Structure formats: C-alpha cells, structure tokens
Amino acid sequence: MNEIREQYETTQFIVVKYGDEQYGVDIKYVDNIVRMQRITRVPKVQSYIKGVINLRGEVIPVISLRLKMGLDEDVITKATRIIIIKLETNECIGVLVDEVKEVVTLENAMIEKVAYDSKDPRANFVSGVGKERDGLISLLDIPGTFAEKEA
C-alpha cells in the first residue's frame, strides 16, 4: 500500500534554464527569486563565486552554477535571475540562472535516477531526470551541490 501511495506522491520544482537545458530546483529549497542586481565581488574565492548581494539587510553569497558545473560563463540578460536557496543549515545562497521558466509538479513515478559518466560535470549536481510535457528536466541535487561551504 505504501508503494502505491509513494508512486502517486508529487514534488514541485521550479524549472530554470541554462542555455537550452532545463533544470529543476525542488521548491522546498527556494526561499526567493530576485531580479539581477549589483553583485559585490569578493577577493580570493573560487572562480564560481560571483560575490555577495544585500537582500533586505542580509548579505548573501551568489554563485554561478554554470561555472561550478563546468559550463560556459554566465551571460547576463533581462531574464537573468538569482534564486535564493535556503539550505538545510538555514544558510542562504544565491544562484544565478539564465531564466526562471515555470513551476511544475512531477509525480515521483515520473522521476528517474540517472548515472552520469564520472567525467560528466553534471554527475555531482543532478539527482535525476523528470519527464514533463515539454521534455526532460535535469533535477538538481541541492544538498549534494552545496555540501561544501561556499563562502
């Protein structure tokens, strides 16, 4: 009986785009989505850490997930957003995304685990793939992606 219930349980994801690829961020980790704003650079940090922003009096580090995943440099456009991720430790991290597309609800049965080649930069960042009407969505592993302290 529990297996049947789990099969029909759902999870909501915010779909974001990096170029032509779609990624899903589990909505339980999303604290806020803000327009691109001035990022203050911080010296002597990893190249994927873009700097910090001041969001309602709170200083939040902002990272380029593109660079962390080994993709090309971010191109800032009018559609660029910063997703504020709230980690299980209650710390917040801003993540640059090319575009926030929509919120989708996926049945757990529509999510498949994937095994990337260890040389694929996405191997450490994607926990599975969700099947959706517009195609496939690579689901980001938020706890795994931010397991190390960013700033």
Question: What does each model-identified segment do?
Answer:
Residues 1-151:
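An acidic, low-aromatic, low-complexity terminal/linker signal
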